[in-house]
C-alpha cells in the first residue's frame, strides 16, 4: 500500500506540485522532500528496507533526476519520472512531462503497476472495479462461456478473441502501457458472506478499448465494453458497474468521446446504453461490423453519461 511519497524536482518541473501535495495530505499519505541524491539513501538498512521511519516498499518517488530514478528502480522503489524530453528514463514506472494532471489515483496506479499489484479503479456500494490479474483469467473465461454471452464484446474484443492466452498477456501489459483497459468487476457481498474465502467474487468485467475504428471527433476516443455473469442480470449491477467506469473515464482519463456497440438483437443492452446517456451516432444508428448488424451509439460529454437516474 502506498503510504509515503518522496519528491525531488527542479523548479521548472514543480508546476502542479502544491496541489498534489495538498491532495496527498487529504488522503493521509506522507509527503517527504527527497533532498540530495546521496542523502536519500544514507539511512537505508537491511530488510525491511527503510528510510528513517519509512518502509521503502510503501514509498513512491517523484523526480526529474534520471540517476535517482534508476537507482530507485534498482532498489525496488516505484518511481514517477518527470521529463519534457523523449529520452529514456530508466527506472521509472511511468514518465510524464509535468505534474499538472497527476493525482493520487494516478500515483497509486503507478505504485501498483511497478509492484505487480492489480490497482483498484473504483469502489461502490456493492462493487469493486479492479485491474485483472492472471489468477482471474480462469474465472473470467468461465463467465464468457455462459449462455447469453454471444452478445458480449461486439467490437474489438470479439475480434481479438477471448482466450486464456490472450487474457493473460493482456493482464501483463495492458494497464502498464495504457493506464486503462478491461477491469474485473468484483462483488463485495461475497466476501462479507464468506462465499469465497473472504475474497470478493469476480462476476464480470467492464472497461474500455481504444475506439480506433471511429473517425469522428478529436482527442481520446474509447469504446465501453462489459460482460456480466448471468446470475447477476436484472439486479442493477450492469448499470452500476458501467457508471463507475464512465465516471472514472470522465475524471481520470480526460476522454473526449466514449462509444458503445450493441448487437441489434440485444434489447437489454440497448436499454442499458440509453439509460447511461448514449444516443445513436447517426439518424439510423446502425452500422456493420464483420457482417453483423450493430447499433453504434455515442455521447461526446462524459458528464452526461453519469447523471443520476431520474
Name each region found by the language model.
Residues 5-7, 19-30, 94-231, 244-248, ...:
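GNAT-family acyltransferases
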